[in-house]
Amino acid sequence: MKRFLLCSFALVLLYPAGIDMYLVGLPRIAADLNASEAQLHIAFSVYLAGMATAMLFAGKIADQSGRKPVAIVGAIVFMMASLLCSRASEGSLFLSGRFLQGVGAGGCYVVAFAILRDTLDEHRRAKVLSLLNGITCIVPVLAPVMGHLIMLRFPWQSLFYTMSTMGIMVGLLSLFILRETRPARLAPRDLSPSSSAAESLVNRFFVSRLAITTLSVSVILTFVNASPVLLMEVMGFSRGDYAITMALTAGVSMVVSFSTPFALGLFKPRTLMLVSQGLFLTAGVTLSLAHTNTVTLFGLTLICAGFSVGFGVAMSQALGPFSLRAGVASSTLGIAQVCGSSLWIWLAAILGISAMNMLIGILIGCSIVSILLIFSVAPNRSVAEHEEIPYQSRS
């Protein structure tokens, strides 16, 4: 079991590392490529577009050919794309590399969740996904610090050499440590009507959890995207103050994420999901009424706590019905989360909504819609039946 957890954690970490590692070098990258920082900020959206593109195909391929091949190919693509970024001499080539980085990270991300669905029951999966969320929160703290230390002595290209090395390490783990977890496919005659209905992507319960997780990811990505404007322009923080504040909020996320597995032993998953959305709603109201930096920071802290306590539980519930189509389900969740959050951020920018109002709007909208879905759509009885994997591959 430890090998599956190790490999899943490593596969997931490529995604946030690809976002956060290079940001500290953005001014120098822009200068060397004769591009403005504003032009290169589109690299974030390009990276997410690459992830979404990979997710369109990775899940189905993982269900048909296995988790291991997709993980290996994803790591190789991430490694080679990182090298392409390091060799870029102009903006378009750099953005192409960022897109391919997203493709590699997206494939690995999908496989990681499919592996956890294959190997863990619902109760353990919810705990592990909460821990995974906590570990993921470490990356936004450590990656900029690591990037800063690297750039004290080396050029910005070294940031992408580091990411390339990460891709190599994940590829080696996938090749030599990871075992195939894809369950053996049942013949059509062996699939009962209830099984087919439960593993349908238009299943009412799955759609509700897809909506909840997509809205939750939209909240946290809106926070990350808006945080430089909120903290440095609106609140007047220096770059150092901004880094410290983001480190503290990430610390809150880690503490709550690592505490959630213990909370699951005391409370029902639905209770934690309601607490999560309650924290989002409280954060939205707090930010809308805030007149001091202290109150605003308290509201931002509630966002991190709310996401950490509920996201892993909701993801576990969403994957629960899928024993044979975990890859496709994981892809669908990833695509919805990436595209949904990107659409909201893009739409808010087009409409000229301020960073604060953008954040308040998604917080209140997410909490109201999610609370209604949690109360109105309960887990199907058949979900528990599909927690068991019919046949486990030993390859």
UniProtKB/Swiss-Prot annotation:
Alphabetical list of PROSITE patterns matching this protein: MFS (PS50850)
Gene3D superfamilies in the cross-refs: Multidrug resistance protein D (1.20.1720.10)
Organism encoding this protein: Salmonella typhi
Membrane topology: Multi-pass membrane protein
GO cellular component, one term: plasma membrane
Subcellular location: Cell inner membrane
GO terms assigned for molecular function: transmembrane transporter activity
Keywords, comma-separated and alphabetical: Cell inner membrane, Cell membrane, Membrane, Transmembrane, Transmembrane helix, Transport
Membrane-spanning intervals of the chain: 4-24, 42-62, 69-89, 93-113, 131-151, 158-178, 217-237, 247-267, 271-291, 295-315, 333-353, 358-378
One Pfam family, short name: MFS_1
CDD domains reported in the protein's UniProt record: MFS_MdfA_MDR_like (cd17320)
Protein family (similarity comment): Belongs to the major facilitator superfamily. DHA1 family. MdtL (TC 2.A.1.2.22) subfamily.
Name of this chain's protein: Multidrug resistance protein MdtL
Periplasmic topological domain: 25-41, 90-92, 152-157, 238-246, 292-294, 354-357
All ranges on the Cytoplasmic side of the membrane: 1-3, 63-68, 114-130, 179-216, 268-270, 316-332, 379-395
PANTHER family assigned to the protein according to its UniProt record, in alphabetical order: MAJOR FACILITATOR SUPERFAMILY MULTIDRUG TRANSPORTER MFSC
InterPro entries (alphabetical): MFS, MFS_dom, MFS_trans_sf, Multidrug-R_MdtL
